[in-house]
Design a protein with these regions (language model features):
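Structured domain cores in non-transmembrane regions
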Residues: 43-110
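Glycine-rich, aromatic-bearing surface loops/beta-hairpins
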Residues: 121-161
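N-terminal signal peptide c-region/cleavage motif recognized by signal peptidases
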Residues: 12-17
Length: 161
């Protein structure tokens, strides 16, 4: 009896996640550049902001040599579909403007992200999913509204209207 109830709960959660039609932003840890991948959901978007201030790993953007970050640094770079503005070394917030924010389009940008934990899982130069958790993505829509989503331990921030 209990097992069938658990299956129903798990299935319901999977259906809910699959039905999410909002915007999503995924963080991909990589070397030498970390990457953010955007999927525009049910509403047109004009820009996306990333706010690392609430992240479990006390994350920062490492954009210059000799600054706040560790070893490797990489400035913000368009990887397809965004206009990349400068980001100060050690900053915790960035904003990119979308070249084409129509429903269903994708965009990506890269930058180095480091954590500031003394006992981090993979060292301060690499970010794990648990360290990104709590960071915020703000999706700016074409009609001027903002939709906010919190990154989870899977490195995803999704708006499910």
């Amino acid at each position: 009896m209990w097992k069938s109830g658990a299956i129903v709960l798990l299935t319901a959660g999977a259906v809910q996640a699959a039905d999410c039609a909002g915007a999503s932003l995924r963080f991909v840890e990589s070397a030498p550049r970390d990457r953010f991948e955007l999927v525009v959901g049910a509403q047109n978007l004009t820009a996306v902001r990333v706010d690392l201030r609430g992240s479990a790993g006390r994350l920062i953007f490492d954009t210059a040599s000799g600054g706040t970050g560790v070893e490797v640094f990489q400035p913000l770079r368009d990887e397809g579909g965004v206009t990349a503005e400068g980001v100060a070394d050690g900053a915790q917030m960035l904003r990119v403007v979308l070249k084409d924010g129509q429903v269903g389009t994708r965009a990506a940008f890269s930058i180095d992200v480091d954590d500031r934990l003394t006992g981090s899982d993979l060292g301060q130069i690499r970010v794990t999913g648990g360290e990104m958790a709590g960071a915020i993505a703000v999706f700016e829509t074409a009609d001027g509204t903002q939709q906010q989503a919190v990154f989870d331990a899977r490195n995803r921030a999704e708006v499910c209207p």
